[in-house]
């Protein structure tokens, strides 16, 4: 090795050699790691190593913080802790796969002197913005600290090549190991205890900032049996049932709701805690549910982080697991039956028919495997004389390699984290449309033979996954930015697309194959003063069409919106839980809502930003709670017994302009009250002065 310089390639070689030695004799893991660390400190190019260390450390210190826990100091952490620096970006499916491992490391090792720091390293323009990263942190409930490398200065200096990447630092910010890619990052945890043993005299093993805010084990056990209050966040997908009801999945609150088209909620499915429990709807658990589709009066659910397909039967009011083991799969062929078959990050679903015998199959966009899979409800014939066995699940489109290659042989084509999938018609032929998110394109699959082609977006180079933008047009000249949803309107022969990272809707006219931005007019008459314009979107995701209406999950706004396709108008859907069957608290009660209106340049402080208390006319507390930065513009606070006479809401909150924060307090009177709801508005005027 050239000892005149020390760089990331040096660490790649050292880490690879160490992993090879451990693979040959895993029983000597601790010995290998200890010997490696001793040699690292005794290298004859220590001056170059120190310079390499200092350059990385100084660049990290310049990054903007996005999410920090109480007491966290970046500089002190690097001197006193073992730091697991996790280079990730929230659009990347492989980064998502490793999040449970990083959260587990934070939970198990934070008291022992290990700190996890997420270094968000964006691919897309949309991902550079602090507010969008915060939404991703909140949706995924990330407990560790996150900083923003929005210019990729640390990413480039380290020489990162792939998401995710982990760089482990010893005390005094000395880089020790580098793990690149999903298959290698999973080794991170087995290295930590040997590292701690080696540096036990140098590491401050006091509780880290993230552990300070953790609840006790008794609290966790108690919470498991108690459904969370119905605060539905980060809606992801929707479907309309045969009897005209709307089902919505909420990735942030790990629940589904089944409601009438007018918003009256029939069922809330799931207790809101991330997990994989089957059973009755009050006890069932999901983990980031996404795509939905109905078949034979049951609703099929892509339970993404559980790597499973679940089934909700509204008649029995129960949920069971159909496909998946609950663990991340790596199989790219499949063929096993039901819950024996491991899968990876299913994202969306659609029901279609075999082109040969017209039997029904469930199609799954498997974002984690860059493929489309099929589940056969009964034995059926498929392309290339393949027989799909009853209850078996297997890959039918995509080699499993990430890419943008079109091919007449479906298993030779490559996809890039396919998300939305739907049926449609093109040139008179039944087809599938796929929102191929990481190639920023829409792909078309001819159902007759599996031929995979491009519709819009992407690039002619099958390895170019950075051909994104925001441009109307046809074919490769049209540009999208990480689209996540597709829905076909048969009456007008239009394909509607959620161009997610452009915060827009687009549509493709099947007669001209031209893609254009689709703008709508807000006619929402129920909007409160200061509420967002319903025609503005923030990471729109799933969408579904029912008659001439299109429903859209506007994820980061935590709204469901309804568009009248005949008139190009939009309203926000509002949900009435007053008669929900499985919410015992809703009987004889009304929902209390709060909206907070701030001056344009202000925002609520990150994390816990204040408290609220609702009192009766005698000044006695009816209910109370905390305010957080991530609550939507109109938040459901609690349920209030209808016999209570509400006088006002008292509040204390902290608002910030840049780095200057001010504590505000006061009272808010109800602005609207009916038998089912009571609404409050806190309006904050421009403060005269700010203090830190």
Predicted regions and their residues:
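Conserved beta-strand positions in repeat-built beta-propeller and related beta-rich domains
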Residues: 248-252, 301-305, 362-368, 432-438, ...
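Structural microenvironment flanking redox-active thiols in thiol-disulfide oxidoreductases
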Residues: 97-139, 150-155
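Extracellular/lumen-exposed scaffold segments
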Residues: 539, 566-692
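Gly/Pro-rich loop segments of beta-rich domains
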Residues: 205-236, 263-288, 318-347, 382-419, ...
């Amino acid at each position: 090795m050239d000892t005149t310089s020390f760089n990331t390639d040096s660490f790649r070689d050292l880490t690879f050699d160490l992993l090879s030695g451990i693979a040959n004799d895993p029983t000597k893991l601790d010995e290998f790691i200890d010997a490696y660390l001793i040699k690292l400190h005794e290298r004859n190019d220590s001056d170059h190593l120190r310079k390499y260390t200092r350059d990385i450390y100084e660049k990290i210190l310049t990054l903007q913080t996005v999410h920090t826990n109480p007491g966290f100091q970046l500089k002190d952490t690097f001197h006193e802790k073992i730091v697991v620096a996790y280079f990730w970006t929230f659009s990347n499916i492989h980064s998502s796969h490793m999040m449970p491992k990083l959260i587990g490391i934070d939970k198990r090792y934070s008291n022992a002197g290990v700190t996890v720091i997420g270094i968000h390293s964006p691919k897309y323009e949309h991902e550079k913005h602090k507010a969008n990263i915060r939404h991703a942190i909140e949706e995924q409930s990330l407990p560790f600290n996150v900083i923003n490398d929005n210019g990729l200065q640390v990413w480039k200096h380290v020489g990162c090549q792939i998401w995710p990447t982990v760089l482990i630092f010893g005390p005094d910010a000395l880089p020790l190991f580098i793990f690149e890619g999903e298959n290698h990052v999973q080794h991170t945890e087995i290295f930590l205890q040997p590292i701690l043993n080696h540096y036990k005299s140098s590491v401050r093993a006091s509780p880290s900032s993230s552990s300070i805010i953790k609840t006790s084990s008794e609290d966790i056990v108690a919470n498991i049996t108690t459904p969370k209050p119905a605060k539905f966040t980060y809606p992801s997908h929707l479907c309309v049932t045969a009897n005209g009801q709307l089902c919505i999945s909420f990735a942030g609150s790990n629940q589904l709701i089944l409601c009438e088209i007018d918003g009256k909620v029939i069922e809330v499915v799931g207790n809101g805690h991330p997990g994989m429990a089957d059973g009755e709807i009050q006890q069932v658990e999901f983990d980031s549910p996404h795509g939905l589709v109905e078949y034979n009066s049951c609703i099929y659910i892509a339970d993404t982080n559980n790597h499973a397909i679940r089934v909700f039967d509204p008649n029995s009011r129960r949920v069971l697991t159909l496909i998946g083991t609950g663990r991340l799969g790596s199989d790219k062929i499949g063929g096993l039956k039901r819950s024996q078959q491991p899968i990876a990050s299913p994202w969306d679903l659609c029901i279609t028919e075999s082109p040969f015998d017209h039997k029904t199959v469930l199609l799954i966009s498997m974002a984690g495997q860059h493929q489309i899979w099929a589940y056969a409800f009964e034995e059926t014939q498929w392309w290339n004389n393949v027989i799909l066995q009853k209850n078996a699940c297997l890959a039918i489109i995509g080699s499993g390699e990430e890419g943008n290659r079109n091919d007449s042989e479906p298993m030779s084509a490559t996809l890039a984290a396919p998300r939305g999938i739907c049926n449609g018609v093109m040139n008179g032929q039944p087809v599938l449309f796929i929102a191929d998110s990481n190639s920023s394109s829409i792909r078309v699959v001819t159902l007759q033979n599996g031929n995979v082609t491009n519709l819009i977006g992407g690039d002619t180079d099958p390895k170019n996954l950075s051909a994104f933008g925001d441009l109307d047009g046809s074919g490769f000249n049209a540009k999208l930015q990480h689209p996540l949803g597709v829905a076909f309107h048969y009456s007008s022969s239009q394909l509607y697309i959620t161009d997610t990272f452009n915060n827009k809707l687009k549509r493709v006219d099947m007669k001209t194959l031209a893609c254009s931005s689709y703008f709508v007019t807000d006619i929402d008459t129920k909007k409160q003063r200061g509420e967002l314009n319903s025609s503005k979107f923030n990471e729109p995701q799933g969408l579904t069409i029912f008659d001439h209406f299109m429903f859209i999950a506007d994820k980061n706004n935590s709204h469901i919106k309804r568009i009248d396709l005949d008139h190009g108008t939009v309203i926000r859907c509002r949900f009435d839980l007053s008669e929900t069957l499985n919410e015992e608290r809703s009987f004889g009660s009304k929902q209390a809502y709060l909206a907070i209106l701030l001056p344009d340049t202000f925002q609520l402080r990150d994390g816990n930003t204040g408290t609220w208390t609702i009192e009766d006319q005698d000044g006695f507390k009816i209910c109370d709670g905390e305010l957080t930065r991530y609550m939507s513009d109109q938040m459901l606070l609690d349920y209030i017994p209808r016999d209570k006479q509400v006088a006002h809401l008292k509040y204390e909150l902290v608002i910030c302009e840049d780095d200057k924060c001010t504590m505000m307090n006061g009272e808010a009177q109800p602005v609207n009250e009916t038998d089912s709801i009571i609404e409050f508005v806190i309006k904050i005027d421009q403060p005269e002065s700010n203090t830190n």
